[in-house]
Amino acid sequence: IDDIIKGEKIEQKKFFSKSFASTSFLMDDKLSNLDQFKDILSKFINTDKQEIIKSLLDSNLTGRGGAGFPAGMKWDFCRKTKSEKKYVICNADEGDSGAFSDRYLLEDQPLKVLFGMIICGYVIGSDEGVLYIRGEYPKSIEAINGAINSLKEEGLLGENILGTSFSFDLNI
């Protein structure tokens, strides 16, 4: 750095060819099709809600928005809040210029986005989720609509999901 500041020529001989990140921000393929979705969803909606929150808290999972707020705490606060109607909101506005993480998730991982919303709805006691997707992302809207329709056709979204008393619907 000192050489750069002085304006001297720098001989660059070292290149890093591997990542030193402690975690991967890319999602795995465990929810890439409807059969996997159904199996995992069935396990979750037959699990005690407090156990799911404890697992979230223990995992230290945080949101992708940059604030680093623990997801388990957020879900626990929502679950304990008394309200006649609760909503799960996915704000995929992506207001930061040059940011495409929301678009990537919506277009390439729509089942994972919807899975998170459905499980959140189960845990906090909500029967409705709303996604805000900016109009400049028509492919994102198309991908999410397609995933919503597929889930409804398979009985994985809507009334009495997988034969349980849990109902959840999604709107864009």
What are the functions of these language-model segments?
Residues 1-172:
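Feature of Fe-S/electron-transfer and energy-metabolism proteins
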